[in-house]
Regions:
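S-adenosyl-L-methionine
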Residues: 1-136
Length: 136
């Protein structure tokens, strides 16, 4: 069990990023009143200064994508990744060059380029990574 690649709650609590994680997870999960009880339990367990929503979050795909990217960046940092590692995971060609035989999120990348004109996930995760000042 000690070798499983998972973070335990104590690691998150002492990471300095617990608040950022909890606030974003609350906003991603609480989008209707079905989870009112869950949010109340969360509110009871969290310090008062945590910025938890007062009402379910209105679904906004753009904002949700940013919160998800911020969580991806935080967890990549907590797993000990460096910028080049994260770039490789998001898009091996970005590190190895065109023709790299490794693929990670090819379907996501192709869909986003086709639908959005860019690999948005990669851009947002790396923007969040830089915003938090990881690996600097």
């Amino acid at each position: 069990v000690k070798q499983f690649p998972i973070l335990i709650p104590a690691q998150i609590q002492t990471s300095g990023y617990e608040r950022e994680i909890v606030e974003r997870v609350a906003r991603l999960c609480w989008f209707n009143h079905d989870l009112d009880g869950w949010l109340e339990e969360l509110r009871e367990e969290c310090p008062e200064e945590y910025d938890l929503p007062d009402e379910p979050i209105i679904w906004n795909e753009e904002q949700r994508t940013v919160w998800q990217a911020e969580l991806d960046a935080i967890f990549a940092h907590l797993y000990g990744l460096r910028t080049e590692d994260l770039r490789y995971i998001l898009d091996p060609e970005d590190v190895c060059g065109k023709g790299c035989i490794n693929e990670t999120f090819r379907v996501l990348k192709e869909r986003e380029i086709r639908e959005l004109g860019e690999y948005r996930t990669k851009r947002l995760v790396l923007e969040a990574w830089n915003k938090f000042g990881f690996d600097n």
